[in-house]
Amino acid sequence: MNAAAPLKHPVPGTLRAAAGCLWEGTEPQNAAALEILNAGQQVITPPVRDAVVQNLVSLFRGDYLLARLMLEEGRFMVFQAILCLSAAQNPEDRDSWLTLGRLQARLSSSGLTSRNRIEALVAIFERYGFIERRKAEEDLRISILMPTARMWSADALFTEMHLSPLCREQGQEETSAGASQLLARLSHGGEANGSSHQHADPMAPAWSERSIAPATAGHRNWRRSFAPLLQDYFGMRMQHRSISALAERDGGYLTLLMLLHEAAQTGSSRIQMGYESISEHAGISRTHARLLMEQAETLGLVQLHARGGRDIEVRQSAWDAMDSWLTGNFAYLLATV
């Protein structure tokens, strides 16, 4: 519904001041990242964007647990930090061990979330089998947070839902090759050929038994190399306020995805999506759905022409915001490939 969006990235160094220091002693922006982020040649086309939106809607719609754990921005940040900090651990360096205290120190110092919320989220991840605590063999007094196969599988599937459409993109050979290479590193069967992975069954949640597999060495290596970029990655997402503001609330990002998906499917900017339908698919109350739509209107993403979601206009700014958001996310995901 709109032209391809150019890659956007803030001036190097500006995010560190805004987001705080997560990775002490590390320069998060390496040469490879700068080349990709500042080349200004990467674009996201409407077909790629629509395919990503469809993938995410198929994956998360109706899957209340996974949507809450991975789409709400604060939980997403903790999820990502756990994976990267775990992959970057050095058994010989106790300061690198992923303990609850270290996770709290890294994230709470940035101002992105509080220590109490981090502890609560860790308990939730543990309750649903995404992480477990193990005593360090070198010091039984210390408990290490360990991402389980369930968490690694959810991360691999989430990444695949974003990147698989890029593998089929014509005229973007370098980007397509990078996406295919990364998916191959995450895949156990090496089937990253741009087609849907066998685990990407929308009827099987990412945390179900069908999709659980231990992380590949390539997956861990990618997360390890991504760790120095994580601070700026979070900062980039914070700069996209029209989307991140919705993503900070339960069901907000999924609601936006469903609106864009419906508009793309119908080929019209004027759609109907009742608050009861949003409530059912996103696992939120109808009152919360109404408040999300009112917030989306305040942010300039939609215009409400009738009550109850009977006439919603998806504005061009919503497509532009999603294009810019996905472009920035793609740049970071591929920065270390």
Which functions belong to the PLM regions below?
Residues 312-313:
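Long, charge-rich, low-complexity alpha-helical segments
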Residues 142:
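Conserved catalytic core of two-component sensor histidine kinases, primarily the HATPase_c ATP-binding
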Residues 126-136, 297-307:
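A short, conserved structural fragment
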Residues 276-283, 293-294, 300-304:
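Active-site/pore-lining binding-face segments in mid-to-C-terminal subdomains
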Residues 138, 292, 309:
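Residue-level "edge-of-site" marker
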Residues 112-127, 283-297:
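Short amphipathic alpha-helical interaction segments
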Residues 1-114, 127, 137, 145, ...:
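Intrinsic disorder/low-complexity detector
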